Amino acid sequence: ESHYASLGRDLVNDGHEIWLLGGTGDQAGAAAIGAEIGEGCINLAGATTILDAIDLIGLADRVVTNDSGLMHVAAAVGTRVIAIYGSTSATFTPPLTDDAEIVSLELDCSPCFKRQCPLGHKNCLNNLTPEKVRLVL
């Protein structure tokens, strides 16, 4: 969450507006990210229908996303995708678009496809810095 918030703050400082999207299960994480970003960030996690989310993603210039359903929505509607892969792999579930950048550390322990790190460190995400993501924006 702190990496997303750091990236979001940088983007807001560069003049961008941030929309946080996701389901009800994403509300707590999105609230934490939104609170860290502050002004310039609109938290819509759990507050939109899937059709609303599709429309909003279609209006966006680009989407920074983890490997998720909304990543595939962004690819389908033609919005530029910056896809962050930690424990998953673009080899198995890539965004189906030519307008995508994949950001992954491709560690020896990944992909493990686990929500909880079996090694207890989550280096696949913790070491994937906001600066690395900014390089492909």
Language-model features, listed with the residues they occupy:
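Donor-binding and catalytic core of enzymes assembling or modifying cell-surface/extracellular glycoconjugates
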Residues: 1-86
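Nucleotide-sugar donor-binding patch of glycosyltransferase catalytic domains
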Residues: 43-44, 75-137
